[in-house]
């Protein structure tokens, strides 16, 4: 079964949106297999955003993600990478439709509430970066037959 990495960023944590965001994914039928509240180190932030290292906004990304706690999440389910991205909306909240997480709660591109892996390859890399294997729980959800054919 497919897995993805989600980070509820400092603005989402500070605004008390963690429960609402997790609820959306659970109601969609995705299973939580990893969940932790953490203070992101500068080293982890730099590794996570390494692809943006040469961009002018890199320092701001690192400063923001390390400024306050983040909720790191691993979700599992059929098509979870693409579906989670659709549920989040586009990067700029002002261009995200209402009904998406960013469309409903975001105001500014620099405070867009949530990060989600953009591909299976990114998901694997990000999950390995943010979680030790022992932090991911293998468990059987009984709702599977009610969600998938």
From Swiss-Prot:
Its EC number is 2.7.4.6. ATP binds at residues 9, 57, 85, 91, 102, 112. Its main location: cytoplasm. Its cofactor is Mg(2+). Belongs to the NDK family. GO terms for molecular function: ATP binding; metal ion binding; nucleoside diphosphate kinase activity. Keywords: ATP-binding, Cytoplasm, Kinase, Magnesium, Metal-binding, Nucleotide metabolism, Nucleotide-binding, Phosphoprotein, Transferase. Major role in the synthesis of nucleoside triphosphates other than ATP. The ATP gamma phosphate is transferred to the NDP beta phosphate via a ping-pong mechanism, using a phosphorylated active-site intermediate. This is Nucleoside diphosphate kinase. SMART domains: NDK. It is an enzyme of class 2 (transferase). The keyword Mitochondrion does not apply. The active site is at residue 115. It catalyses: a 2'-deoxyribonucleoside 5'-diphosphate + ATP = a 2'-deoxyribonucleoside 5'-triphosphate + ADP; a ribonucleoside 5'-diphosphate + ATP = a ribonucleoside 5'-triphosphate + ADP. The gene is ndk. The keyword Disulfide bond does not apply. One of its GO terms (biological process) is CTP biosynthetic process. CDD domains: NDPk_I (cd04413). GO terms for cellular component: cytoplasm. The lineage of its organism: Bacteria, Bacillati, Cyanobacteriota, Cyanophyceae, Gloeobacterales. Disulfide bonds: none annotated.
């Amino acid at each position: 079964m497919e897995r993805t990495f989600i980070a509820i960023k400092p603005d989402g944590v500070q605004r008390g949106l963690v429960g609402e965001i997790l609820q959306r994914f659970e109601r969609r039928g995705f299973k939580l297999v990893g969940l932790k509240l953490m203070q992101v180190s500068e080293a982890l932030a730099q590794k996570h955003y390494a692809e943006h290292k040469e961009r002018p906004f890199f320092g701001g990304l690192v400063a923001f993600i390390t400024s306050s706690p983040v909720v790191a999440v691993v979700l599992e389910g059929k098509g979870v990478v693409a579906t989670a991205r659709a549920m989040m909306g586009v990067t700029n909240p002002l261009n995200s439709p209402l009904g998406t997480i960013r469309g409903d709660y975001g105001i500014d591109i620099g405070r867009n509430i949530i990060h989600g892996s953009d591909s299976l390859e990114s998901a694997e890399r990000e999950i390995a970066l943010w979680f030790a294997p022992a932090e991911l729980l293998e468990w059987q959800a009984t709702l599977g037959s009610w969600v998938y054919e």
